[in-house]
Structure formats: structure tokens, C-alpha cells
């Protein structure tokens, strides 16, 4: 499959192409020139467009400054030796000056912008090529050109801060998960460690007394049952303290996630999952989230549909998309192994198929929530 040809980097979208419309004005103005001057003018216009393209391709690189100098030099030549109206091309470098993150580089580029905008005006006025009235008509546009670098720089700062904030939030989430794991591990050790050790000792004692002292064996077995019930109660109390996500909540989250990824969402099936235990709902929610994350990251899909069917003894969840599907050798990559491991905890199963997109089917035996 051939890759689509892109003149400008894809991350800038359609914006660079819009600015190219403004090069039509100098192109038409050069038609009034003749001979060598016209040829040089069109040559500089080609160089200007090439520099414009290279500026987008070299953002953050050392060559960015060189191409900006080329663009400014072309504008200076146009507005001094051709016509003052070419100064409107200053909107191009004014945009790129705002790309500088370092204050020193920004100030230098801004001073250069001031020079290429004001020097031609003074030169043409002293040479009596333009009137004071014509200069005043240009003044509002000069002000906009000189203000725009600050606006562009402020916008990029905000984008950078938002990216850092998002990264910090992800780190906070990860730290919260780690803290929760440590807390659970500590609670399990404190609440179950002693009980499980006691059960181990009693099981060893029962093995030795099974033949010689049946009555004592029955008593120890009864105590083991009591201890195991106590351990089960402790586990349930521990789980109840955990923040679990219900299937209904996760469906809402999935809708928001898919909408952010420009993927339409359709849901069919049950809307009441109250009979399903919180632990089972939490595991199902994590599996659904993993499947949807795979769709957004890998499928290039435009639509996702989830169907949940509840039967007397089991639940079936089908997650399908209209994306490119996945190769057979990668079917159980991209987090699907993790989903399968989670489902094993509740005796569930996972199947993945490729039918006009990827189809992920989860089957979970239903264990109703304890009253």
C-alpha cells in the first residue's frame, strides 16, 4: 500500500496550506514586472515558498533559524526593490518567530522582524516612493504582524503546559495504583497471613491424626472450616474497601474515550448489572477498557459496537470495530494476554476473530452478588 504524499508534516494539519493562498498576491504583482527583474522576482518567490515548507519541517532544529533568515531576506528584497505592498508577506515569518521557546532566540528573531518591516517603510518614504497616507494604511497590518509572534508563543506555551499537566496526571494515576497495590498487599499480609499459616499447620496435624484420633481430626477440620470462612470474610471486607468500577460506569467512560478518538459508539444489551458481584464487574470493566484502548491505538476504526447478553448462567460481551483488523500472529498481543489472565480469575474466556474488523468476545460465568 502506497503512502500518501504529504508536503507538510501531518501534525500541523491543513493550516500550512491555507497560508499558501497569500502567495497568489505577489505572483500576480510580478506579472507587472518585465525582463530580468520579473525572473528574479519569481525565483525569489519559489525560494520563499521552499523556505516556508522547510520551516515547518525543521521546527526545533538548528536549520529553522537559517530558513527563517532566508524568508525574511526575500521579504526585505521585495519591499525595498519592488513594491512596499510585498511587506504583507511579513505575516509568514511573524508566525514562525513565535515558535521559538528560548527567550533569547525569540527576542533576536523579533528584532529581525521589526527591521524587515520598518526599514522598507522608511526607505520607500525617504525615496518618495510612498506617501505618508499610504504608510498609515499599512500601519494597522504592521501592528498585527508585530503582535502575532507573542500570541503564537503564548499558544505554544499553553499547549506545552497542558501536555506537562497531562503527563503529571498520568504519573499521579500510576502512583495511586502503586499505592493501592502496596496497601492491598499489606492488608492481605496483615489479615490473611496468620490465618493461612494456621490453616497450613492444622492441615498437617489432620494428616497425622486422621488414622489414630478421628474425633480430634473432626474437631480440627471444623476449626479449619471456621478459619477459612473468617479468611473469606476478611477478603470480602478488603474488596469492599477497594474502588471498583461497575459495567455501567465503564460503558459511559468508553463512550467518552471513543468520542475523543473520533470513533462512533453503539451499545446494545442489558442495562442492569446489579446482580453481578463488584469484583466481577470490575474485572469485566478492565477488560472492556483494554479492548477499546486497542481499537483506538491500533485499528484505525471509525465505529465501535458493544453488545452485552445476559443468560441464566453466563454473560457474553462482544466488542467489534470496523477497522483494519489484526494479523493472526498479533491477535493475542496488544494487551489481550492481560485480558485473558484477568478473565481466568473469574473462570471467564476470551476469543478474538477478524471479520470486517476485529471482534473480541468475552464469556463470563455468572456468580450472583452475595446478599
Curated annotation (Swiss-Prot):
GO annotations of cellular component type: plasma membrane
Subcellular location(s) of the protein: Cell membrane
EC number(s) recorded for this UniProt protein: 2.7.13.3
Domain Histidine kinase as annotated: residue spans: 187-368
Keyword Nucleotide-binding: yes
Keyword annotations from UniProtKB, A to Z: ATP-binding, Cell membrane, Kinase, Membrane, Nucleotide-binding, Phosphoprotein, Transferase, Transmembrane, Transmembrane helix, Two-component regulatory system
Name listed for the protein in its UniProt record: Sensor histidine kinase YvfT
Native source organism of the sequence: Bacillus subtilis (strain 168)
Lineage, broadest ranks: Bacteria, Bacillati, Bacillota, Bacilli, Bacillales
